């Protein structure tokens, strides 16, 4: 049991050292470089703010179905990514959940865009905070 706890602690430490906290403009600029249309950036930055406070290394608490949400966009491990503990996942994005926790947001952006294309903005419970008028991101560029 002690060995298991040590391994878990080391894994979390390794993931945490690769994570970072972004801000609205750094996220908007990186997402733009990754091909996200500029007219969507205010929505994405709002979602990231409300889901993770712009932190890439966040693993949310267990949901009512036992699943967890990962990364800057809090992507669910039952449907979109493969949890490290081997639990069943549909893994629609074809990646490990730990790939959503690093300072490189490429995987998170690709997966989040897939979710948005399939389910729309309401896939995020925080969308209610982002569906109205949002501050412009023009000053970020």
Swiss-Prot record:
Cellular component aspect of the GO annotation: extracellular space
Classification via Pfam families: Lys
GO biological process: defense response to Gram-negative bacterium; killing of cells of another organism
Record-annotated C-type lysozyme domain positions: 20-141
Recorded superkingdom: Eukaryota
Chain's role: Unlikely to play an active role in the humoral immune defense. May have a function in the digestion of bacteria in the food.
Protein name as catalogued: Lysozyme P
């Amino acid at each position: 049991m002690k060995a298991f706890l040590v391994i878990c602690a080391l894994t979390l430490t390794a993931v945490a050292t690769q994570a970072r906290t972004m801000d609205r403009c750094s996220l908007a600029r990186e997402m733009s470089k990754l091909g996200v249309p500029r007219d969507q950036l205010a929505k994405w930055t709002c979602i990231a703010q409300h889901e993770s406070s712009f932190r890439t290394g966040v693993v949310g608490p267990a949901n009512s179905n036992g699943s967890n949400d990962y990364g800057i966009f809090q992507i669910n491990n039952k449907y979109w990514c493969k949890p490290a503990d081997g639990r069943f996942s549909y893994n629609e994005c074809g990646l490990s959940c730990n790939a959503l926790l690093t300072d490189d947001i490429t995987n998170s952006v690709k997966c989040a865009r897939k979710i948005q294309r399939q389910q729309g903005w309401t896939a995020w419970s925080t969308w209610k905070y982002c569906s109205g008028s949002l501050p412009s991101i023009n000053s970020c560029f």
